[in-house]
């Protein structure tokens, strides 16, 4: 009887020591080139926080407001801290190539999300194809008869030179250049008030020649209504297409200020990126990318409006 009791107690002790080890929380890093004041990034961040809550793992998050050096330092700090996995955007084409090599050499999974960089050897990418998005936006304006040869298109962006805008412009140029449609990219910054001020100033000075607008980022596209109202532009007077990952833009589409918005599943993008990092940390290599995105107009904008409002 005593021997049997010892066996039972020993088995219980083994079980108690094994269970915590199996359920031990991991530490991941979620690193963004964006800024906390940008409404769309609150949704990307929400996805990361939800993942942490659902899995019980720790997710250290940071925003770098377009500061490439700061983001590079953050990724290297995560490597030095022996993170279980890293998820990061690409702040500038080629800027993380060497750092990704460092992560891979340290056997730390590093997943790229939101802004792709094919030059860097990430374990996987989760997000949209920005070149294709840009091409679709330009083609949308052409196919709908909203721009033609000789027209001028204004393309505001938060951070000129950042990966997302550079790739989107590449796609846009492939459509517009052969058709003789010209455009200008202008800086709007990541500060909401400054975005509106700069956009109002530009449109006030150039309203007569602007035949269409492509918002290369969520903050600029989500500011269209406020800019139009201040300048005296009526909804639909100037065609607009661009990013649509915020309630500001879904409402602009529903009310006719923006013709079409690009959805990228911001919450799901972060959630899936962290899931892939976790999977890789457990020894299962992803071996694939996850591409998101859908262009919506007024007839389907309510779907995305409800998602973003949590309904």
Give residue ranges: language-model regions:
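Hydrophobic alpha-helical segments within soluble ligand-binding/sensing domains
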Residues: 71, 126-152, 194-196, 245-249, ...
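Hydrophobic alpha-helical
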Residues: 76, 84-105, 172, 184, ...
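Hinge/cleft segment of the Venus flytrap/periplasmic-binding protein
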Residues: 26, 156, 164, 174-176, ...
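Short beta-strand elements at the ligand-binding edges of bilobed clamshell
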Residues: 61-63, 117-142, 185, 255-267
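Extracytoplasmic "Venus flytrap"
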Residues: 27-51, 55, 59-76, 83, ...
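Short beta-strand elements in bilobed, periplasmic/extracellular small-molecule ligand-binding domains
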Residues: 53-65, 151-156, 175-193
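Short, solvent-exposed amphipathic alpha-helices that sit
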Residues: 39-57, 133-137, 163-181, 198, ...
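Flexible loop/hinge segments that line or gate small-molecule binding clefts
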Residues: 93-132, 246-254, 258-259, 300-308
